Regions:
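Basic, helix-initiating cap at the start of DNA-binding domains
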Residues: 1-26, 33-39, 56
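Short amphipathic helical patch at the helix-1/turn junction of helix-turn-helix
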Residues: 27-28, 48
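Amphipathic alpha-helical segments used for helix-helix packing
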Residues: 94-117, 163-167
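Hydrophobic alpha-helical connector segments
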Residues: 60, 74-100, 151, 179
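Amphipathic alpha-helical packing segments from all-alpha helical-bundle domains
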Residues: 70, 113-140, 145-149, 180-183
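C-terminal peripheral helix-coil segments that are non-catalytic and often amphipathic
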Residues: 92, 128, 132-136, 153-191
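Short amphipathic alpha-helical segment with a characteristic S/N-K-E followed by hydrophobic residues
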Residues: 15, 53-61, 68
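Short hydrophobic/aromatic patch on the recognition helix
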Residues: 40-51
Length: 191
């Protein structure tokens, strides 16, 4: 690999890392290309050389994070697990990605249609994992419709908790703080 190619890859990686930190601290909508260039100590033109538009840069970061979240969710939330282990793993994955998910849902109305579709697909995948887990652990016999109504009720509460997050630090996990309430709701709905 040539020196120029290596330098381009390092610059691209730097832009992605610094922009991800800015997004973490300020949200997707409040990050400007000027701030990104200042944070990276490069010109705005370099950002556009690598990503063409700020939207492409943000989409790259968001889609990468969505992919990582979906991968971890599928690895940790295996439908054949007991309900308790499944729920514990789900909450652990949510806590791991809490700041990202909170920002994502707060800015959802302003994101591109392609990103919204990716998020909807992720939600469908998650709901299907829950449905399969419920079917594999039939403590309470629910119809398919009732199962999905209960799953939607559960997710709306998790979603609300993510929207309530105000301070974006690793130590300030709203899901961790409300874990007991989330578990209690889950048990009320599914046991």
């Amino acid at each position: 690999m040539g020196v120029r190619s290596e330098s381009k890859q390092k610059t691209r990686k730097l832009i992605l890392e610094k922009t991800a930190l800015l997004i973490h601290n300020k949200g997707f909508l409040n990050v400007s290309s000027k701030e990104i260039s200042k944070e990276c100590n490069i010109s705005q033109g370099s950002i556009f050389l690598h990503f063409q538009t700020k939207e492409n840069l943000l989409n790259t970061i968001l889609l990468t994070n969505i992919g990582h979240f979906e991968r971890d969710l599928n690895n940790m939330c295996v439908p054949k697990l007991s309900k308790d282990n499944f729920l514990k793993n789900y909450i652990d994955v949510i806590i791991q990605y809490e700041s990202f998910l909170s920002r994502l849902y707060k800015d959802l109305p302003y994101l591109s249609e392609a990103l919204s579709k990716s998020i909807n697909s992720l939600e469908t995948t998650t709901k299907n994992l829950f449905f399969e887990n419920i079917r594999n652990n039939p403590d309470k016999k629910l119809s398919i419709v009732d199962s999905f109504i209960s799953i939607d009720a559960f997710f709306s509460q998790v979603y609300k908790n993510l929207l309530d997050k105000e301070i974006y630090t690793e130590s300030n996990s709203i899901i961790r703080q409300r874990r007991g309430k989330i578990v209690k709701l889950y048990r009320t709905l599914f046991e």
